[in-house]
């Protein structure tokens, strides 16, 4: 599927591309230009019913398919993703807006997830213990759980779906994916390549839409589990409604990630890492650096360095060479971001770099330049809320103790970083910070696919996180067999 031919995005159900029964459509925009590039249907619960029934029917045979055959299909799928790497990256840039280099990196992360899923059979093995009593042995066996529903966001249209469905189907489940209605084109291409890899009909299904599709998955009795990534309010809703309907749910939510810079930090390194973490992907990622807490003695130096580096950032269409900062996803998100900048000024923060004034902001597309506030306090909205945009807040502190105390007062706890050369400070940080993913002298501490991904508090709802052994646990159920064999 190409942007030129994708006038109306279809659903993918039972191995067929079918039109939604809904006549309601939503425009898909190129956020760098504001141009409409496709129309996506706002599908109904009837569409969801068709997809779930197709997935349930496919589960009967797919769950019995030999594990090595499942793995071979995923290995072939991985190679097809590699073969189409540049096309996939360009498609991400066109419908999401991030720079081509960042999109290229996202494709890599998606490929790594598929590689992990292809090797997951080694993690799916059960456990046995002979002679738990005379002549008696026990064993644990893993089995798939059925139809899985996946609900994914706009900001990583390849990586997040690849967190979910490859591992789920490797474990023998079938899958119904609801991609973001803002970025449906990449998901469609992923399905095309999965079919080319030999994935049987009905194992992967896609239903495009919004609220009705989400509720359809949450309410359907044949859907046994829900994987979700998105905003905090929706994550909480998905978790509550899904568990009310007796489903397993993992819901990855919002973030307000703190980066702590101590007096002994390498400021050149810290500056480069923070700039990339704060303004990469236009700040639209759950691992973005949102707040910097810096010790007072070096605060002026760090602020000066950050502003100087931010001034060098090239803003524009992500397909253009040298562009680092692309647009935010939609015009209303641009307006929301500008509202937060206004709020920061009104509440007394010092605006040291104003992203509203960049030339690109005044043209076509949904651009907001890199914005930096100094002298931010925890009473301000720009400290409290997830802005999900290129806005960085700087809080000045007297000590590591104070920095950790401030970070721990956030309702979010996805990621946190520290810049220091002190092992003792790193240990204190590791032991006392309330966050799920930690970094030392790195800006984005996102783990590889073979480790669990997610945070604490209002950044995550559930028990088993995405990826790694948590993912295998989430997508399988166990049977215990105790046997007596006497001579």
From Swiss-Prot:
Any single GO molecular-function term of the entry would be:
methylmalonate-semialdehyde dehydrogenase (acylating, NAD) activity
What's the Enzyme Commission number for this chain? Answer: 1.2.1.27
Q: Top-level EC class, please?
A: oxidoreductase
Q: In which pathway does it act?
A: Polyol metabolism; myo-inositol degradation into acetyl-CoA; acetyl-CoA from myo-inositol: step 7/7
Residues that bind NAD(+), according to the entry? 154, 178, 181-182, 231, 386
Give the reaction(s) catalysed. Answer: 3-oxopropanoate + NAD(+) + CoA + H2O = hydrogencarbonate + acetyl-CoA + NADH + H(+); 2-methyl-3-oxopropanoate + NAD(+) + CoA + H2O = propanoyl-CoA + hydrogencarbonate + NADH + H(+)
Which of UniProt's keywords are assigned here?
NAD, Oxidoreductase
Give the annotated active site: 286
A Pfam family assignment: Aldedh
Kindly list the biological process annotations in GO that this record carries.
inositol catabolic process; thymine catabolic process; valine catabolic process
PROSITE patterns xrefs: ALDEHYDE_DEHYDR_CYS
Record carries keyword Oxidoreductase: yes
Per UniProt, subunit arrangement is: Homotetramer.
Q: Can you tell me which family this protein belongs to?
A: Belongs to the aldehyde dehydrogenase family. IolA subfamily.
Q: What is known about what this protein does?
A: Catalyzes the oxidation of malonate semialdehyde (MSA) and methylmalonate semialdehyde (MMSA) into acetyl-CoA and propanoyl-CoA, respectively. Is involved in a myo-inositol catabolic pathway. Bicarbonate, and not CO2, is the end-product of the enzymatic reaction.
Q: What is this protein called?
A: Malonate-semialdehyde dehydrogenase 2
Q: What species is this protein from?
A: Bacillus anthracis
Give the gene name: iolA2
């Amino acid at each position: 599927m190409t942007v030129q031919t994708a006038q109306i995005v279809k659903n993918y159900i039972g191995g067929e591309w079918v039109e939604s029964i809904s006549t309601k459509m939503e425009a898909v925009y190129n956020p760098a230009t504001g141009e409409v590039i496709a129309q996506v249907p706002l599908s109904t619960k009837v569409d969801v019913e068709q997809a779930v029934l197709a997935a349930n029917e496919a589960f009967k045979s797919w769950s019995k398919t030999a594990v090595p055959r499942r793995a071979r299909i995923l290995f072939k799928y991985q190679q097809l993703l590699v073969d189409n790497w540049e096309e996939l990256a360009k498609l991400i840039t066109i419908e999401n807006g991030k720079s081509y280099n960042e999109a290229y990196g996202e494709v890599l992360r998606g490929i790594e997830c598929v590689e992990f899923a292809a090797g997951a059979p080694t993690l799916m093995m059960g456990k046995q213990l002979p002679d738990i009593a005379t002549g008696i042995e026990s064993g644990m066996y893993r089995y798939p759980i059925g139809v899985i529903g996946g609900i994914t966001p706009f900001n990583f249209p390849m990586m997040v779906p690849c967190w979910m469905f490859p591992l789920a189907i490797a474990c023998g489940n079938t899958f119904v994916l609801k991609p973001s209605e803002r970025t449906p084109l990449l998901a469609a291409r992923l399905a095309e390549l999965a079919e080319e890899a030999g994935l049987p009909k009905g194992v992967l299904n896609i239903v495009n839409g919004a609220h009705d599709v989400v509720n359809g998955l949450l309410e359907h009795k044949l859907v046994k589990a829900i994987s979700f990534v998105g905003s905090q309010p929706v994550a909480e809703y998905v978790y509550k409604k899904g568990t009310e309907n007796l489903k397993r749910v993992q819901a990855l939510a919002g973030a307000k990630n703190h980066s702590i810079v101590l007096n002994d930090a390498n400021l050149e390194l810290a500056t480069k890492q923070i700039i990339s973490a704060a303004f990469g992907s236009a700040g639209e990622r759950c691992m973005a650096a949102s707040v910097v807490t810096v010790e007072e003695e070096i605060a002026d130096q760090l602020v000066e360095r950050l502003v100087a580096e931010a001034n060098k950032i090239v803003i524009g269409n992500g397909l253009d060479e040298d562009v680092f900062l692309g647009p935010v996803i939609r015009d209303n998100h641009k307006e929301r971001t500008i509202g937060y900048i206004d709020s920061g000024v009104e509440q007394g923060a010092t605006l040291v770099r104003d992203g509203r004034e960049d030339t690109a902001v005044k043209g076509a597309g949904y651009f907001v330049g890199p914005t930096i506030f100094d002298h931010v306090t925890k009473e301000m909205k720009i400290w409290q809320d997830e802005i999900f945009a290129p806005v960085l807040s700087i809080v000045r502190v007297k000590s590591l103790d104070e920095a950790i105390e401030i970070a721990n007062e956030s309702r979010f706890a996805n990621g946190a970083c520290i810049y220091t050369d002190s092992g003792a400070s790193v240990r204190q940080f590791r032991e006392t910070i309330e966050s799920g993913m930690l970094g030392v002298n790195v800006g984005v501490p996102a783990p590889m696919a073979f480790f669990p991904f997610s945070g604490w508090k209002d950044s995550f709802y559930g028990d088993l996180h995405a990826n790694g052994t948590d993912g295998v646990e989430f997508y399988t159920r166990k049977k215990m067999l105790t046997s007596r064999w006497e001579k």
